């Protein structure tokens, strides 16, 4: 907490009294009581689950896992985010009260990971859907790295001005079709545009004749490139 010195008050008040601004007091209280909403969809979440044990004891940072987004101010995305899960993730973020923060944990969350090059259903970066405060790369990151990310987020909160945080709030969200992103309005109502969330048919829904016909139409030159 940033302290402010008042010479006239220091002469009459005991040393146990701390003088500061309301903004710094608010930041200090929030960074010491972050309540994360755990959003784990893949193996990265297993590393985060290790923090709950006695070896790392993340309770010392004031972290209290919550199962409801309305009681959380931090969402930690760990694992692959598919286009089918994209509206659910955005809705969870919209339901969290301000101010709220996001930690993107793992390569799959940040860039799509190994699914980003040849996958029709993976979002290439969770920051296309929600604003991210701290990026935590790794496959998967170690629990010590998660603690370091939480420490960096706490430092960011301690220097934060509340008015600037509200002013820079993201108003638009991005949805993807075949990795082409389209900006849409905020979806507080929960009414999603189903056209933007169209999923390509799986191979089980395609007949064998159509499958081999599409394969035969691709030249060997395209396959090499």
UniProtKB/Swiss-Prot annotation:
InterPro entries: NADH_UbQ_OxRdtase-like_20kDa, NADH_UQ_OxRdtase_20Kd_su. GO terms for cellular component: chloroplast thylakoid membrane; respiratory chain complex I. [4Fe-4S] cluster binds at residues 43-44, 108, 139. It is found in: Plastid, Chloroplast thylakoid membrane. SUPFAM superfamilies: HydA/Nqo6-like (SSF56770). Its main location: plastid. NCBIfam families: nuoB_fam (TIGR01957), PRK06411.1 (NF005012). This is NAD(P)H-quinone oxidoreductase subunit K, chloroplastic.
